[in-house]
Design a protein with these regions (language model features):
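Anionic-ligand binding region
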Residues: 189-216
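General beta-strand structural signal in soluble alpha/beta enzymes
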Residues: 23-25, 57-62, 103, 121-126, ...
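A C-terminal functional module that forms or caps the active site or interfaces directly
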Residues: 219-287
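Solvent-exposed alpha-helices and their adjacent loops that cap or buttress functional pockets
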Residues: 13-17, 22-23, 52, 113-116, ...
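Phosphate/pyrophosphate-binding betaalpha-module
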Residues: 117-182, 197-200, 210
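Glycine-rich nucleotide/cofactor/substrate-binding loop typically near the N-terminus or early
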Residues: 27, 32-34, 40-95, 216-231, ...
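N- or domain-start disorder-to-order transition segments that initiate the globular core
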Residues: 1-19
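Divalent-metal (Mg2+/Mn2+/Ca2+)-assisted nucleotide/phosphate chemistry catalytic cores
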Residues: 72-149
């Protein structure tokens, strides 16, 4: 039963009725992750990429206190231009719904909504994780990954985080990290981090088989599929590290903490890299959406993929 606080677009309802593949897309990247006009352009482009593979996109977000699964162009435009939107994670749903607010769902927020709506595949840029020099500052994304039976396609965790610690928490949460055509955990802007993944898959069908096997066993955690950014846009890890350290120093000097920290750090890394990190971010988002669509098609081949 879908809660009355949810609204599934007619397109999503139809896709579910006919067993057609669907890919969930987050909206925090629209409301908080990218500057205008890139945010709306990218939201539309990601949906187009998914549609190109004959898969239905389901952008998730809050409009006037309703959790939308699938959005119209007008709704995407509103989220992209609304001056005050809340960043929606697990703790924020009740507040935003009661206040009839608009909001962009984080990885955690999107996982919750997608799970309730019965979706099985989700594409994002990078997950949250354990913050550097702040081991008690752990993203809610990790816990939701541990209890959400979805395939989540990403480029690893955001490079501003403590990647080894993030992988340790994922292990604790029972989340397998599957490298797509890679044996290393990607570092978001960079191709590799020298950190090993749990397993490797070379095709979308292999990913689908892993997910089916996990869920048939009754293990309801996510399968985290990590994909390196496209090589032509990837940045050298050492170069990115210089930008991150400088951005962290500035954030500390300005006492920027909590939910404001990640947007500030990502924006400063973009400025320090002359926009190269932004272009890498856009490229990996496109790449992840395409792969997620291919995996969704493989899962939809068998009714077992729609448990």
């Amino acid at each position: 039963m879908i809660p009355e606080t949810f609204f599934l677009s007619p397109e999503i309802v139809k896709a579910q009725q006919f067993g057609q593949p669907i890919v969930a897309l987050e909206s925090a990247v629209i409301t908080h992750g990218l500057p205008r006009p890139y945010n709306l352009e990218l939201a539309c482009e990601l949906e187009a990429i998914v549609r190109h593979e004959n898969v239905t996109p389901a952008t998730v977000g809050l409009i006037d206190g309703k959790v939308h699964i699938g959005m119209s162009l007008a709704e995407l435009q509103r989220l992209a231009s609304e001056p005050k939107t809340r960043k929606i994670s697990r703790r924020d749903f009740g507040i935003a719904i009661a206040s009839k607010e608009c909001g962009g769902t984080t990885v955690a927020g999107t996982l919750i909504a997608a799970r309730i709506a019965g979706l099985r595949v989700f594409a994002t840029g990078g997950i949250g994780g354990v913050h550097r020099d702040a081991p008690f500052d752990v993203s809610a994304d990790l816990e939701e990954l541990g209890r959400s039976p979805l395939v989540v396609v990403c480029a690893g965790a955001k490079a501003i985080l403590d990647l080894p610690a993030t992988l340790e928490v994922l292990e604790t949460m029972g989340v397998p990290v599957v490298g797509f055509q890679t044996d290393e955990f990607p570092a978001f802007y960079s191709i590799g981090s020298s950190l090993p993944v749990t397993a490797r898959a070379n095709t979308p069908a292999e990913v689908a088989n892993i997910a089916r096997a996990q869920w048939k066993t009754g293990i309801n955690s996510a399968v985290l599929v990590v994909v390196p950014p496209p090589a032509e846009y990837a940045l050298p890890a050492a170069e990115v590290e210089i930008y991150i350290r400088k951005a962290l120093q500035e954030a500390d000097a300005k006492s920027i903490q909590g939910a404001a920290a990640t947007p500030f750090l990502l924006n400063r890394v973009s400025e320090l890299s002359g926009g190269a990190s932004l272009q890498a971010n856009l490229a990996l988002l496109r790449n992840n959406a395409r792969l997620a669509a291919l995996i969704a098609k493989e899962l939809s081949i068998s009714a077992e993929g729609r448990l």
